[in-house]
Regions:
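Conserved catalytic core of nucleotide-sugar-dependent glycosyltransferases
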Residues: 8, 26, 30, 34-126, ...
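Active-site-proximal specificity loops/subdomain of glycosyltransferases
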Residues: 1-25, 39
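Alpha-helix C-terminal capping segments
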Residues: 20, 131-132
Length: 153
C-alpha cells in the first residue's frame, strides 16, 4: 500500500532489499520532500562517522521524548489515528538519518514491531536497541537540507 501510514513497512522492506543485495557500512535515509543545500555534506558526514570512537550506529536530528504524549500528527495527516501515543525514546527525524549495517540488522529482526507503528522515523528509533543508540550523532539537518515546499515558495 502506498500511503503515509505504510511508510514504516516500506522503509523496513527497502532496508531488507538493500541488506540482501549490497555490502554497506552505513545507509542514509531522507524524506523525498527535502533538498540537499550543500554538495559536500555526504563527504563531510561520512568522514565524521568513520572517525568516531566508539562506533556510531545511528544519527540525524535527534528528538528526545522524555515523557510519553498523545500525538497530534493527525492534524497534518488526517489518515493517522487520533489516539496515537508517542512513547519515551530517542529518535532521529525523517528528513535525514543514518544507520550502520549492524543497526539495520537489528531493526530487521524487529520488522513486525516496526511495521505496527505509523510514524516511520519514530518507529526506527523506538525499535532500535538502546545499545546502538548510546553514541548517537546529532546532525543539524536544517543547516544542510531545505523542505521542498520552502524551496518553491
Amino acid at each position: 500500500k502506498d500511503d503515509y501510514n505504510s511508510l514504516p513497512s516500506k522503509v523496513i522492506a527497502a532496508f531488507w532489499v538493500i541488506q540482501q543485495t549490497l555490502t554497506f557500512k552505513y545507509i542514509f535515509k531522507s524524506d523525498d520532500s527535502v533538498l540537499l543545500q550543500n554538495d559536500k555534506f555526504f563527504d563531510t558526514i561520512i568522514g565524521v562517522i568513520t572517525r568516531m570512537v566508539p562506533k556510531v550506529h545511528y544519527g540525524g536530528k535527534i528528538v528526545n521524548v522524555e515523557i510519553p504524549y498523545m500525538s497530534k500528527y493527525y492534524l497534518l495527516h488526517p489518515e493517522l489515528p487520533k489516539d496515537m501515543i508517542i512513547q519515551s525514546t530517542k529518535y532521529c527525524t525523517g528528513s535525514l538519518y543514518f544507520l550502520s549495517s549492524e543497526a539495520v540488522t537489528n531493526l530487521l529482526s524487529k520488522r513486525e514491531s516496526v511495521c505496527k507503528e505509523y510514524l516511520e522515523d519514530y518507529a526506527i528509533g523506538l525499535n532500535l536497541d538502546k545499545i546502538l543508540k548510546t553514541n548517537m550523532l546529532n546532525i543539524q539537518t536544517n543547516k544542510y537540507f531545505t523542505d521542498f515546499e520552502d524551496f518553491t515558495s
